[in-house]
Amino acid sequence: MKKAIAKILIVSGEPAGIGLDLCVELAYKKFDAEISILTNCIALLDRARLQKKKIKILTKPTLHAGKGGLQIIDVPYEKKVIPGKIEKFNSLAQLSAIDIAVNACIEKKYDALVTLPVNKKILSSSGGKFTGHTEYISRLCGTQNKEVMLLVNNNNFRVALVTTHIALADVPKSITKNKLEQTIKTLNNDLINNFKIKRPKITITGLNPHAGEGGEFGTEEKRIIMPVINKLIGEGLYLTGPIPADTAFTEKYMKQTDSFLAMYHDQGLAPFKALSFNHGVNTTLGLPIIRTSVDHGTALNLVGSKKINANSFFESIALAITLTKNKKI
């Protein structure tokens, strides 16, 4: 029986950022998958010259051999890309590229999507607020009213978020019993179905300092978080919490946790990036497609330099391949 080969689609991200540099690096990294990149051919070749590397544009899908060839789907840019310098209309072309990529994955032309960093501020200027790939792709998939969520992953260290790109002042009112319950269920289901963890152990942080200290520093733990945890434990889920966030990410809990669930963006991502920067992978849970991405931004100041670290990008591709294989089991 012929082994199924994962088909991965990459969107190269902000043209002036390091996305193109990372794609050049990919040309010399072998993967057991067919990999296609949505990008501008001219800009990619220019970036390769800047890096003093030769790449070959491939016209037919093939196993990614890592011998300098890249399968490209050309995306037109309005102006010449100047490394490190934002050009609004080139940046906005990324929205169309994301649209094309997501639809291609929905139509099962590709097994998984890997996205490289974009400039959120520029993309928001298109008329609709762009708060991030997670929310934008969720709308494209028609899952915006479901608990789609961000999970960051580095081997067996995983952190998921209840809320993502909202102001800290808006976090408490955004955490309702229903939202928290659905978020925990989404996390649990994805860990079972996509990561193949039979009974996930999930450690949940509190919202307030000391997890509220019995109501002294806030009541969300007593009113919302604890009742939801108890309800779901009664339904058979393996949950621990609410744990004070300042001690949650310590060796004791790391050893007994398949995934942490943090209440807001920096509460979960600050410790994760401190421990896993350049090795972390973002993935979006609750979507009908597989989507992964790097754990860093556009890094305009590093474009064309030798300081670029491609580890997170390569790990994003590797996880996309793994999740594809798991989904087919």
Q: What are the functions of these language-model segments?
A:
Residues 1-220, 225-329:
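Anion-binding alpha/beta catalytic cores of soluble intermediary-metabolism enzymes, centered on
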